[in-house]
Amino acid sequence: MSFDLKNDISKKIHFIGIGGVSMSGLAEILLERGFKVSGSDMNGSPMIDKLKEHGAEIYLGHNEKNINNVDIVVYTAAIPEDNPELIYARKNNISLMTRAEFLGSLMKGHKYNIAISGTHGKTTTTSMVSHIALTEDVDPTILVGGNLDIINGNVLAGKSDYFITEACEYKASFLEFYPYIGVILNIDADHLDYYKNIDDIENTFAKFVNLIPKEGYLIANADDKRVARVASNATCNVVSFGIDNGDIRAKNISFNESGFSSFDVYKSSELLFNIELNVPGKHNILNALSAIASALTLKISHKSIIDGLKSFKGTHRRFEIKGVKNGITVIDDYAHHPTEIKATLDAAKNYPHNKIYCVFQPHTYSRTLSLFDDFSNSFSGVDELVLADIYAAREKDTGVVSSLKLSEAINKNGVKSSNLHSFEDIVNYFKSKLNDGDILLTVGAGDVFKIGEMFLSK
């Protein structure tokens, strides 16, 4: 099944789970372009309210009666097979498409698709590329995994041939895409509930590269051995980036007192320009280099690259300063993989502080178990760590792994750590601990951000 953005305008599209970040974004793009849209979700949300305002039919709860004169039903991997709307659509031969298939079909209607992949950094890099494209005024369509202030949300329905989106490797969903420019930021072990091992993940990224046409471009991190290996077999044009290696490199790097970097950008031996970032950490230099390489490939002006990156001050839940209370700075970050946690902590160490106190909420039992040893070594430099209980997401607790067990392992590695079960207990614990100049850092992909909000409101 495919969907034609230009010729299927008369079709009505129904989204099961319309309240999700990506699904609501897809629905909004369709509504902006004049399609009839309906959708269901278990709970209301600001995103759903926004879709209602744009004319979507919204149903709370899942019921076969919600499928009303629908031509295509779109669903995510999170929707179980016994969902009544999914069952009804199958029984009545209504066209079904996964979220990834549908997004791929939307991309097919554009010429310059920029698909940003990698285990870490997708949302930030997609946001950086978006800032540059908007500064250049190319009127792109944008679909990003976090809220971006410049577009007042996570989606923008542009009218040009430019389409900028994240390309997630989970369940190989990005193999449904049509990239003209494919970015690979890094390849790391994750989603081991789906993939056999890291080699399996690397092979899937190689398949993603094969989707790029010969006249298209792969933007590849030359400092990542697995990315470099995948890039060496590409049949399209390849532009590499990195700090130590690559066609596009950062030199003369310096950090200010807030941990924000400035650096010179070189193309081979040629100095192009100087960049000033307003997001912290060495990892964001690599993210910026990939955005710069993408923009140069599209012949976007140097001025728009410089100004676009300077105007980017982060997305929600990516080293987001939530507030300051009694001299204590509360910072929240979506990091849920050991590599991401280390990068976030490096950024925190470069931020002005006395002590760093951290709350980590592990995300899914399968990830916590498969990366247990890596997690136990990820919190070096934290003055004290509290683990909230594991955020289950789509999984069930088998009793094999727990936050308590992880906390004990972290203690053995020399970082003071404990496990508290309720958010209220965690907030009260830190209320008695923190002093002027300290940082409270909440980390995880679940709802751990609420702890910081509770701390600031008490």
From Swiss-Prot:
InterPro entries: Mur-like_cat_sf, Mur_ligase_C, Mur_ligase_C_dom_sf, Mur_ligase_cen, Mur_ligase_N, MurCDEF_pg_biosynth, UDP-N-AcMur_Ala_ligase_MurC. The lineage of its organism: Bacteria, Bacillati, Bacillota, Clostridia, Eubacteriales. HAMAP family: MurC (MF_00046). Belongs to the MurCDEF family. Pathway: Cell wall biogenesis; peptidoglycan biosynthesis. Keywords: ATP-binding, Cell cycle, Cell division, Cell shape, Cell wall biogenesis/degradation, Cytoplasm, Ligase, Nucleotide-binding, Peptidoglycan synthesis. GO terms for biological process: cell division; cell wall organization; peptidoglycan biosynthetic process; regulation of cell shape. Cell wall formation. This is UDP-N-acetylmuramate--L-alanine ligase. NCBIfam families: murC.
